[in-house]
Amino acid sequence: MFGQLLGDPNKRRLKNYYPIVSEINILEEDISVLSDEELRGSTNEFRQRLEKAENSDKQLKILDELLPNAFAVVREASKRVLGMRHFDVQLIGGMVLHEGQIAEMKTGEGKTLVSTLPSYLNALTGKGVHVVTVNDYLAKRDAEWMGQVHRFLGLEVGLIQQDMNPRERKKNYQCDITYATNSELGFDYLRDNMAADKAEIVQRDFQFCVIDEVDSILIDEARTPLIISGQVERPQEKYQKAAEVVMKLQRASELGKDGIDPEGDYEVDEKQRSCVLTDDGFAKTEELLEVKDLFDPKDPWAHYVTNALKAKELFTKDVNYIVRNGEAVIVDEFTGRVMPGRRWSDGQHQAIEAKENLAIQPETQTLASITYQNFFLLYPRLSGMTGTAKTEEVEFDKTYKLKTSVIPTNKKVSREDWVDQVFKTENAKWRAVAKETSLINKQGRPILVGTTSVEKSELLSTLLAEENIPHNLLNAKPENVERESEIVAQAGRKGAVTIATNMAGRGTDIILGGNSEYMAKLKIKQVLSSRLVKPEDRHNPPVPLQRDKASGFKSLEVKAEAKTSNQSSSLNNLFPVILSDKTDNELGQLAAKLVKEWGDRALTLGELEDYIATAAEKTPTKDENILAIRRAIHSIKTEYEVITNNEEKLVTEAGGLHVIGTERHESRRVDNQLRGRAGRQGDFGSTRFFLSLEDNLLRIFGGDRVAGLMNAFRVEEDMPIESGMLTRSLEGAQKKVETYYYDIRKQVFEYDEVMNNQRKAVYSERRRVLKGQELKSQVISYGEKTMGEIVDAYINEELPPEEWELDKLVGKVQEFIYLLNDLKSSELIGLDTNQLKVFLQEQMRNAYDLKEAQLEETHPGIMREAEKFFMLQQLDTLWREHLQSMDSLRESVGLRGYGQKDPLIEYKNEGYDMFLEMMINFRRNVIYSMFMFQPTTKKVES
């Protein structure tokens, strides 16, 4: 009722933007007649106006005033360079982002293009803008694609990639707009705060950030902190032995209740992702290991056994990790991508290596860590966009203070969401998926099937191979990841079938009929790489990987040098048509010309890709080679478009893209993302979810109610079940999971908030030391505090002065400052506490000046170097130890809940005390090190 009275708050918010949209549209006419030079000149005009701002508040006010003109300029540049004009709703999206909100825009509504508006406007300040995406491929694509608009307007565009060295990173962070992934940004921040020298710092101060797929980064990944770690030696044979022992233990069929152990050696709680030994299990494990106590501090085993049990029960090969080149590589549970170089901490990765009989790598110790929540809160202004944010609106507001605005679609959504089909068993479900795929495939419609793991995608792939349905597989396996963009470029073609794990190709639109421009670039790359790219750097030509009945994966090898007409017909699955002789000859001539210019097989693949990306842009250039590649791309695209445009028409008439979901995800939001793949920009399309009562979601969170339903449904295995009660159970289960994970994220955030305040204090102290700001006065202040603390520790004011232990006090001072060895306790008689502090502080300052004079005589400038060295060394060592102590505290406070104490409050209080203790030790250690420091002089040998 209140909603009807007050109206939709989202609509009310959007209403404020329409007058500005009208203003931008009016400006369009005047701006469209400007020359390229004049359009580019707008950037300098805007910057000159911003120079007048005295502070960031004034700057923001001027940015708001510039917005209509700046957006109109970006729209015109985009038309000229990309051939894409921002719709009115995209302008609204840009305003929402500039204001530091989350813009919910449906799939295919051009979120990537929207980001050019606020990023250009905020880059005018010269303080840098970060555009964040979920993976390296998307960051590179957007920097090349959308970066054209910014470069055309005179801005510098940077890109951060996983394999870049610090020098390249620094250069790219200095650009006006930098494209990067969330993990690269986070790790660079942590590395900067471990730098030994100011020159090693790569990032500058944060200003404005736009996060693409904001829900994936700020919600899904918020449970996992970013950790930089160092190696710790632990006995490797213990991992191996524990892995062997747990294989002899029996899992309990159910969880224990009311403190009574179930039958079995250990119980597994999949919901909490934990494994616990029963009393019988403890006894049996101790017997098998031939030890008396698993918790014996001199020979601890409990940690190894628990991790081995988790590796056995909760970490599944080809779901949570894959084995590649003798290593266990993590698979990201949200994107389905492999994460090389990442490892589970706390000995879990070693337990998995032992389980798989792989070489066990050393265990690691945390050197620095931060959660994404606290990392992104470091930005003074933060914004984000996604196709699905409304379900998490409350969390965005509570955790990040971000409001969510739903942007209307440019065209009406024409997608049909068909009713779910639920089967009793998983086998029946997969047979039904294969059947529907076959049926829709015969209609000529493209199909996208979303699966939740590598294992499931390969199971379905086998079923489709048995039905002789050609298809592409997009999952975390390395041979597929490299072909991700090729697969997605073809996913909208007539009769195409694509199986994707957790929609790894997120961020790439599926265009009905196929993406002719992308396929043209691919064709150029295939032809030129054989003549221009070094053999060792060359990948196999891009060929569809298809299931073959007899041999699993069959990669159809094609010689890139071969004439197109002689190529295997399978290439028609990749490219829409065999090129005409005219275009084919042009490509041969182009290759010969470029070999003369750039050398025979002299380029790396990356260099060739950069040339092709530049040629694909519409940015003006005088480089003849780039222009020649540009003409070739245009010729190929024109021939391909004849087919893709016709296929688009046929596919649209047949009903558009059909999306099949094979399991409800733990979050409704991820289901909506998969559905949103169909029906982009008003296209026709349909979606259907196939589920089984054995699916993880229902099994773990659906509880006993679903078990009862399974028995109640005495129906054939292949008969789909449709029931209101079942649908409600499903939605109830999803809400339960969402709440459960929200609570976990909230807890992670609350606990890391304690660490965050400490981290900020340590990092700002560290940054000040690196910059070398007034180090001497800083060290002297440490010394003064230390002298005060010694007086407080040795003088009891409740006793008469004659009973004060002045000898011990002087002894302690001399431990720290050997230069005060002549100090006598008799000199302190008659002084009160404050006078003692003032006297000793004065003595310490004199001693420090004396120390400096002695050292500077033989080693000029060494004192400042020593101050910097010891301050960094002590801070890093103590912070590292403090992180370990805080981890241990976090584990131990959980038990205090049983004593009616709030674990979080206990953690805050004790953590604060531990931090104060750490800072006291830091000050004392620096003072001690500075006075004890004696530089050695190297003897010059004749």
Curated annotation (Swiss-Prot):
Q: Which residues are involved in binding ATP?
A: 90, 108-112, 509
Query: Topology with regard to the membrane?
Result: Peripheral membrane protein
Q: Does the keyword Transport apply?
A: yes
| Gene Ontology cellular-component terms listed | cell envelope Sec protein transport complex; cytosol; plasma membrane-derived thylakoid membrane
- Select a single GO molecular function from the record's annotations and give it: protein-exporting ATPase activity
Reaction equations catalysed? ATP + H2O + cellular proteinSide 1 = ADP + phosphate + cellular proteinSide 2
Q: List where in the cell it is found.
A: Cell inner membrane; Cellular thylakoid membrane; Cytoplasm
Its primary localisation, in coarse terms, equals membrane
Is the keyword Transport in the record? yes
Q: What is its EC number?
A: 7.4.2.8
Q: Which GO terms describe its biological process?
A: intracellular protein transmembrane transport; protein import; protein targeting; protein transport by the Sec complex
PANTHER family to which the protein is assigned, alphabetical: CHLOROPLAST PROTEIN-TRANSPORTING ATPASE, SECA INNER MEMBRANE COMPONENT OF SEC PROTEIN SECRETION SYSTEM
Query: Function of this protein?
Result: Part of the Sec protein translocase complex. Interacts with the SecYEG preprotein conducting channel. Has a central role in coupling the hydrolysis of ATP to the transfer of proteins into and across the cell membrane, serving as an ATP-driven molecular motor driving the stepwise translocation of polypeptide chains across the membrane. Probably participates in protein translocation into and across both the cytoplasmic and thylakoid membranes in cyanobacterial cells.
Assembly and binders: Monomer and homodimer. Part of the essential Sec protein translocation apparatus which comprises SecA, SecYEG and auxiliary proteins SecDF. Other proteins may also be involved.
Q: What's the family?
A: Belongs to the SecA family.
Question: What is the name of the protein in this document?
Answer: Protein translocase subunit SecA
- Tell me the lineage of the source organism: Bacteria, Bacillati, Cyanobacteriota, Cyanophyceae, Synechococcales
Q: Which gene is this protein's source?
A: secA
